[in-house]
Design a protein with these regions (language model features):
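Cationic, low-complexity basic patches in intrinsically disordered or flexible, solvent-exposed regions
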Residues: 5
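GNAT-family acyltransferases
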Residues: 9-12, 20-140, 157, 161, ...
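Membrane-interacting alpha-helical segments
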Residues: 115, 119, 171-181
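Conserved catalytic-core motifs of GNAT/GCN5-like acyltransferases
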Residues: 123, 168-170, 188-206
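Conserved acetyl-CoA-binding loop-helix of GNAT-fold acetyltransferases
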Residues: 135-137, 143-160, 176-184
């Protein structure tokens, strides 16, 4: 499940206050160096930090009902709505939520028509060394191993640069492709989250997948 950010830092702070590590740990993380969202390269892909200029490219997934089937919001009705969603995502400090756009390489060059999807981390809790991952792919690019390649390099960034101990993925039972991808990367299915969220006023159940740094094969 790809997640769009909705919570402000104030909401995160309230959540931190409820955590058993308390507000002191929240304020400690606020004094850490600013979180960076670097470009990440693989053999076939480049992952770049999301920017507002990506609106037209991103609309290829945000405006596609098939691509958005397992997303936590309905498809964008037009380009303007996609732009608003990107602006909202970009307003969140990358300490909590960050998104990469995924591009294929062609003769070492990148172009708008080579955009294939996105990967993000969200719900990050630095004091618990935990975050969640989401990904979304243009359907015509499925079955080529692109998203596994993209998620793998993001996992490497999370476990090393961000010093994450646990990564979670919340996947609907019907989303068989994403479940298989998570399992290929080493995630373990840990439980069922019944009616965990509502999309278009309909409840959705998710399965929780978890990957510990000690389980990760790199």
């Amino acid at each position: 499940m790809f997640r769009e950010p909705r919570a402000s830092v104030d909401t995160v702070a309230a959540s931190a206050a409820d955590d058993n590590r308390g507000f002191d740990h929240y304020h400690h993380t606020m004094n850490e160096p600013a979180t960076q969202v670097p470009a990440l390269d693989t053999a076939r892909l480049q992952l770049r930090c999301l920017k507002i200029e990506d609106t037209t490219a991103v609309h290829r997934v945000y405006g596609d009902p098939e691509a958005m089937r397992y997303w936590d919001m309905p498809p964008s009705i037009d380009l303007k709505e996609t732009e608003r969603r990107l602006a909202r995502a970009l307003s969140v400090d990358p300490q909590w939520h960050a998104t990469w756009t995924v591009w294929t390489r062609r003769d070492g060059q990148l172009a708008d028509d080579q955009f294939i999807g996105m990967v993000n981390y969200h719900a990050r809790q630095p004091w618990n060394r935990r975050l969640a991952l989401g990904w979304i792919l243009i359907p015509s690019f499925q079955g080529r191993g692109y998203m596994q390649e993209a998620v793998r390099v993001v996992l490497a960034h999370c476990f090393t640069t961000l010093n994450t101990h646990r990564v979670e993925a919340e996947i609907e039972p019907e989303n068989v492709r994403s479940a298989r991808l998570a399992q290929r990367l080493g995630f373990q299915r840990e439980g069922l989250l019944r009616d965990r969220l509502f999309v278009a006023d309909q409840p959705r159940t998710q399965q929780m997948y978890g990957l510990l740094r000690s389980d990760w094969g790199g």
